[in-house]
Amino acid sequence: MGPSDRAILTKRSMEDVVPRALRTQISDLLDDVRLRGDAAVCDATRRFDGVSLRPDQLRVGSDEIASARVSEHVHDALVDAIDHVRRFNETVRNRMSDWSIEIEPGARVGERFSPITSAGLFVPGGKASYPSVAYQLGVPAVVAGVPRIAVVVPPLPNGSGEVDPGVLVVCRMLGISEIYRANGPAGIAALGFGTQTIDPVRKIVGPGSPAVTAAQVEMQQFGVSTMMVLTPNCCIST
């Protein structure tokens, strides 16, 4: 990469990454989910993922989670990766402790560390398999002690609602059972606003396409906490 290419990358704005037309489209989709709930999520999943679902099919059932399988090689790699991420996050957690000082008689200031009450994890799917994202997001939440962890993952495109088994295996390993199959931006809206099936969460995290990024940016306007706009690899590959 030459100096001119690097200069272009460093000067990219939100308009370059997420065009205004796409943000407008995503904003309309979010409003639809806010107003119509499950029906809008199902419509978006049918329109953008080619998968027709009923509202009662949005949540992945316990039998589907239990029956998910990957090859022995992949399974062993996931176990190893989860162990590494868990050990790192446990070390970080153990280094964090509450503290306070008395700045004047009767007045104390300090910090207290506690998990948020709920977290929504968006795991990309569709054309590729991203179990790595599932454990990179899920392990910190589990180690932190977040009481409720909800996962949204798009179903395999043009199928009958199947979800990447690698993601389900990771969730099973982590004890995460609240998993929803839904279009990315619509699923993020559902996690933020809540629907008839999906309860809202306090924070939404997870990487994705420009449409997913736009959804997270737009949700911040409704007071929903989301992750940073883009990870470095997303900025390069978009």
Regions of interest found by a model, annotated:
Residues 37, 147, 177:
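Short acidic/polar active-site loop segments enriched in Thr and Asp
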Residues 175-238:
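Conserved NAD(P)+-binding/catalytic subdomain of aldehyde/semialdehyde dehydrogenases
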Residues 1-10, 163-179:
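Active-site-proximal helix-loop elements at catalytic-domain edges
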Residues 149, 155-172, 181-193, 203:
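Alpha-helical recognition segments enriched in aromatics with Gly/Pro capping
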Residues 17, 21-24, 28, 36-39, ...:
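Conserved active-site and cofactor/substrate-binding residues in soluble primary-metabolism enzymes
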Residues 99-169:
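Conserved small-residue-rich beta-alpha loop and adjacent elements
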